[in-house]
């Protein structure tokens, strides 16, 4: 009895023409996640996954790299054409990330600021005495 040879055929991925881009910026890192309309994550990238470590992750250049990686992957593999952008966090690199997503060829329909504002939040740390 001869063995049957099975070919590794990749399953074609579904094309997503509309999606949502979540940009989460913190003081230390930037994370860009691209989802479909339902909210299922399609691809993501972060400054740390772009081989940047330590304080370099907090720069605008790192956010640019992360956004470009995620956007290129979404355009190449899932044919993403237009997206809503939801931005969270106080980081400095938000504008750079948005600009890079637009440069990758994704049409931005809505820009929405989603950062949480505390209603008097946590107690601040004790004042430093020197």
Curated annotation (Swiss-Prot):
An annotated Gene Ontology molecular function: structural constituent of ribosome
Cellular compartment(s): Plastid, Chloroplast
Alphabetical keyword list: Chloroplast, Plastid, Ribonucleoprotein, Ribosomal protein, RNA-binding, rRNA-binding
Subunit annotation: Part of the 30S ribosomal subunit.
Biological process, per Gene Ontology: translation
Species the sequence originates in: Stigeoclonium helveticum
Record flagged with keyword Ribonucleoprotein: yes
Keyword presence, Lipid metabolism: no
One GO CC term on file: ribosome
Any single Pfam family the record assigns to this protein: Ribosomal_S11
UniProt similarity note: Belongs to the universal ribosomal protein uS11 family.
Name of the protein in question: Small ribosomal subunit protein uS11c
Main location: plastid
Superkingdom of the source species: Eukaryota
